[in-house]
Amino acid sequence: MGRLALLLACWTTLAAARPDPARTAVLVNTDQPAGLAIARAFMTHRGIPAANLIALPLGRTETLEWQDYATRVLGPLRTRLLAAGLLEGKQEESADPRGRSGFIPTGDARLRWLVLVHGVPLKVAPSGIKGLNPANPVKGDHASLDSELALLALPNLEPEGARPNPWFGRADAGGDGVIRTARLDGASPEAVLAALRGAWAAEAQGLRGRAYVDLGGPYQEGDDWFRACLAPLRELGFPPDVEETKDQFPPTARGDAPAFYLGWYSQKPTGKFGQKPTRLAPGAIALHLHSFSAASLHNPATNWAPWLVEQGAGLTFGNVYEPYLSLTVRPELLLKGLREGMSAGEAAWFATPSVSWQGIILGDPFYQPFAVTLEAQVRAASAKEALGDYALLRHFNLLPQPLGTEALRRLQAAADRSGRLALRLACAQAEQAAGVTRPWKDPLDLSAEEGGLIAEAVRFVEARFGVKTAQKLRAELEKRPEGATPARPGTEKAPAK
């Protein structure tokens, strides 16, 4: 059985483990009402009961002191969840030194997911209170609001340092009372809604695009994590472009349709994926690992997490304070979870080692990037839609290599119908791998593309067909606006196989 058949068989036998809308609460900040439209759009799309919307006045700052967190967020949120029947327990009048009212659980919480929306504060500042475990090398009671709220169904715990996440590496965990959280947030409500709609489109039509992995970070352990993503991406049909130097992908690198962007390590968005024209594919899974990637969500120019939301990420991650490498999200486990049929939120928690710590998860936790089989994507591929080309490319990537005569014929036919450079280049590369020599077609019928793809095509054409042919290709494509496609006959759908 080929890789494609194995992949399809795996997906058809996996039950979609989606979060339960009735057991999901959504928190908005009435002091920043722009988040309400995001909450309503999300709740409507996912069928979350209107009664599960919790609106509290939470101020206008990203950072809260512990007393404010306790009295403005944690206490009132527990009260509302108790009233809604989503939490079982009793609040006490007495408070601890951080201002938290005592809480005694009296049963298992119905609540399973808590989604925080744009405008809800981001993090809790260090209190200065000496911890109970001075031997703990991971010190401090500072944390992301999201990660701290994951413990709201438990008695108040000492927040010094990180706690193990019971969902880490376990698909069947009960959670030990930990409530999984996610956040719909970014620099602007418009960016958040656009990223959400992109994820919903990808869930309905399939996650389509290419993969890019940036190695060369400061520690071998992290590089090993990202390197472990290469084989699974190939097995999924997304053979990645890999940057192995200490630098980011250069601005001249290829960057079309990034469905997966996984890498590190720069403080600010830079390189190819720090450029505004490098838009992510709808629903993209994007992670740039940096200690302070979500220090603020207000300024995408200086923080990777809001930048990736701005660029369209369906799922991304960030750290609000220094997390230490071993306690950050594990990209190879994220891929493992997604491959096994987990939703974006489930896979994110499967890949997160710690709770009551620094991480945040940005995106719709219900999002299923592989809800549509590749077979269905190939059947739906149309010459009218550029992303359909990437479904076809993924299909051909999963066939035995080099491609045989019939597969090459079908790839050539698809490339001719499309008229777009990504598919045409892939066809020429496949022919070269199979030992087939054919002239490069006149570029007049090709659409214009992003600069990195043009550069890759020019290098290939120069090596295979000569300098003059390559120069003609570059001159023709670079004089057109990106995405401009000449009229051509034959825009019927591509055959399935």
PLM features: residue spans?
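Bacterial N-terminal signal peptides
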Residues: R3-T13
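Short coil/turn linking the two alpha-helices of tandem helical-hairpin repeats
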Residues: Q401-L403, A433-T437, F465-G466, E482
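Conserved small-residue packing positions in alpha-helical repeats and bundles
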Residues: L393-N397, A426-Q432, V458-A463
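Terminal, low-structured helical/coil segments at or just beyond the last alpha-helical repeat
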Residues: K468-K497
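Alpha-helical repeat scaffolds
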Residues: E406-A415, T437-A448, T469-K479
